[in-house]
Design a protein with these regions (language model features):
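Charge-rich, low-complexity N-terminal segments
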Residues: 1-101
């Protein structure tokens, strides 16, 4: 499995809140039964690398379907093939090291 961090930022003009669009993205992810986690600066999704690339395109398009004219999207994909990785593994590893020190 791979991990993708995605930040979809609809350019909403005068207003600054994009939470309504972020909520739509999370409704879509839930409907697709994808492991995902919202954090303050974006969303992390777990899946196969090829599926994550296709998903990124779909998530990028969602605000356009709501009438937004400009969307800025940032994608990071960690495609590790030497061992299985899951959502939360990196955080657990750091927390373990913090307990040791």
């Amino acid at each position: 499995m791979a991990l993708m961090q995605i930040i979809v930022m609809p350019r909403v003009g005068e207003g600054t809140s994009v939470s309504v669009y972020v909520a739509e993205i999370h409704k879509y992810l839930k409907s697709q039964k994808l492991a995902h986690q919202l954090h303050d600066m974006g969303t992390i999704v777990e899946g196969k690398a090829g599926e994550l690339w296709a998903l990124a395109r779909k998530l990028h398009e969602l605000p356009f379907k709501k009438g937004i004219k400009r969307v800025y999207t940032i994608i990071h994909i960690d495609d590790r093939r030497d061992k299985k990785v899951s959502l939360g593994d990196k955080v657990k590893s750091v927390q373990k090291r913090l307990r040791v020190s």
